[in-house]
Amino acid sequence: MTVINHTLGFPRVGLRRELKKAQESYWAGQSTREDLLAVGRELRARHWDQQKQAGIDLLPVGDFAWYDHVLTTSLLLGNVPARHQNKDGSVDIDTLFRLGRGRAPTGEPAAAAEMTKWFNTNYHYMVPEFVKGQQFKLTWTQLLDEVDEALALGHNIKPVLLGPVTYLWLGKVKGEQFDRLSLLNDILPVYQQVLAELAKRGVEWVQIDEPALVLELPQEWLDAFKPAYDALTGQTKLLLTTYFEGVTPNLDTITALPVQGLHVDLVHGKDEVAELNKRLPSDWLLSAGLVNGRNVWRADLTEKYAQIKDIVGKRDVWVASSCSLLHSPIDLSVETRLDAEVKSWFAFALQKCEELALLRDALNSGDTAKLVEWSAPIQARRHSTRVHNAAVEKRLAAITAKDSQRENAYEVRAEAQRARFNLPAWPTTTIGSFPQTTEIRGLRLDFKKGNLDANNYRTGIAEHIKQAIIEQERLGLDVLVHGEAERNDMVEYFGEHLDGFVFTQNGWVQSYGSRCVKPPVVIGDVSRPEAITVEWAKYAQSLTDKPVKGMLTGPVTILCWSFPREDVTRETIAKQIALALRDEVADLEAAGIGIIQIDEPALREGLPLRRSDWDAYLQWGVEAFRINAAVAKNDTQIHTHMCYCEFNDIMDSIAALDADVITIETSRSDMELLESFEEFDYPNEIGPGVYDIHSPNVPSVEWIEALLAKAAQRIPAERLWVNPDCGLKTRGWPETRAALANMVKAAQNLRQG
């Protein structure tokens, strides 16, 4: 029983974000479809070779996606909404991009598919849409084509396929309501066809991802797995693959399935090994997800070895990443600016492949010397002064209930704020960022590289802020923002100004489509050495008589969108960040900034996957926000922003944030999300997003008015704000001006009745 290793998936974007650049070039009409496809082929070949060279035995195929892997599965199944379909029913890469970006085959605007977070990660997927009587057929052969590519290159492969039950679980019914699980028998023939094609190609194992099996699923969904897999068994060996949590609660369902192996995330389900070995059928292979695919930390391989060694020899064992390495940067070796101590604590995707090779070799030989050597920096980190700050720990320990309470209740604050700002009905604002032009990015890059001195950099940024204020005043917006020209990323910017964070040069991970982020890494206790945003906010406010919002990223979002420490709880990190940003709120207020937005778009995505674990998380998540905000006086208006959220099941917690105004993403869901606020009788003010900033489409005045009228049926008009769904950083100025002009006009029309 020789141990082999494999990965569940590998980053797609390329070390230099080649995929992003190729996508955006194609979308802009600057390159051909063949140019784009060639980049994809080159990246796949390179990534297979890199994994092989790093010691991986069984390579994943089908983990590559042009936008996201759920959208790829939708095309595989022929699930294309009517508004995006070609007249002849054909499917091509442009169909895929239309679904992701919002466009009809004619070139006319058509709503993009709804986008939401992939389980509790910072990766997004396009939500499958289901209609009654829907037909499915194999229409997009990307997986089969890529299998052919890999086989032609001589690789030992394992195709990756999103499983049918999870696919249905992730989708939404559109139009007439029905049970989407009823579509299972309709999609299974397509899966059977795909598996048959893979078997024809000599494929032995298929990794079939069913991460829904780590959730607390309704019984009817659990019951669906057995008939589904009865239909799929027999053509290839199936590795049923789960991740992001352990599987013990659903083991009875799992062990009844006719599959040949099970992959389990043993990072999150680290205590499950003995139970798995006891309850899995003896002829099943166990794929042990020992190396964390979601972080940047070097693994303690001595600990991982001890975790699995007792069952090696008792059943077939593979060692693997806990989940796809999609969520990790690609290669630590190109990071030349990290100091040696910190760098020794990290492992990116390729280094995680090396870890899997070391584990495999040690488990097969019994020789752990190399594991001990690899793990030495982990032991040293536990005592590093880079990690521990006594002053931060003391301040955190001294927090009391009073620290998370505003001076007065919302009703009292609202009166003070109305007197201070005297805003019109249907007040208009934006979420914070304005287009990051080539000029702005060049300015920041030149400054970072030392090609521009501080004075010239500041002069350049000040000019862009001034222009943003002029644009907003010309458009007639009521509450302005400074535009965030100085910020590269809403989390990275704050991390750069807080102690306890470090940054990479090339630590990019995919967020959605062509969007990549470079998360900061929390390596130690967090504190704020000096004010971060005050100077630019104060400057922007000096340019106008209208209120300018101070813009902060909230503590939970900074936590969720960073790579966190593993040696303390997430609660500890969030509250340390909250205390640092509390000082920023106080400084903004002292500088005359009367409206302060604390963005928490990640509050919901941070939820544990199992509902039974939610309360504890929400309690400390809300407390962190309140610690951050509660220092504000009554007449300082605290805003927060959330996107990609289902709110109905966390409304108590959203209300408990006690923000004076919440702006939310609603346009893609056609204001459906407001149902939650209506049913809860949410007491504070709400800005439902009136257009989708992820699409280049410019909404008409009538479209916006219709959405706002729909919102006013659910929320009293006197408590409604008018704003886009999200920040405008990724948009161009022409479409931004046009969309905001229509938004302001719609608000003015509503004021006039």
From Swiss-Prot:
Active-site residues, Swiss-Prot/TrEMBL: H694 (proton donor)
Matches recorded under PANTHER family: 5-METHYLTETRAHYDROPTEROYLTRIGLUTAMATE--HOMOCYSTEINE METHYLTRANSFERASE
Organism: Enterobacter sp. (strain 638)
MF term (GO), any: zinc ion binding
Family: Belongs to the vitamin-B12 independent methionine synthase family.
Residues reported in the UniProt entry to bind Zn(2+): H641, C643, E665, C726
Pathways involved: Amino-acid biosynthesis; L-methionine biosynthesis via de novo pathway; L-methionine from L-homocysteine (MetE route): step 1/1
Biological process according to GO: methionine biosynthetic process; methylation
Cofactor: record remark: Binds 1 zinc ion per subunit.
Protein's name according to its UniProt entry: 5-methyltetrahydropteroyltriglutamate--homocysteine methyltransferase
Underlying gene: metE
Cysteine pairings via disulfide bonds: none
Cofactor(s) needed: Zn(2+)
EC number(s) given by UniProt: 2.1.1.14
Top-level taxon of origin: Bacteria
Protein keywords: Amino-acid biosynthesis, Metal-binding, Methionine biosynthesis, Methyltransferase, Repeat, Transferase, Zinc
Reactions accelerated catalytically: 5-methyltetrahydropteroyltri-L-glutamate + L-homocysteine = tetrahydropteroyltri-L-glutamate + L-methionine
Binding-site list for L-homocysteine: I431, G432, S433, E484, D599
UniProt binding sites for L-methionine: I431, G432, S433, E484, D599
Function as written in the Swiss-Prot or TrEMBL entry: Catalyzes the transfer of a methyl group from 5-methyltetrahydrofolate to homocysteine resulting in methionine formation.
Positions of 5-methyltetrahydropteroyltri-L-glutamate binding: R17, E18, L19, K20, K117, R515, C516, W561, E605
Record InterPro entries: Cbl-indep_Met_Synth_N, Cobalamin-indep_Met_synthase, Met_Synth_C/arc, UROD/MetE-like_sf
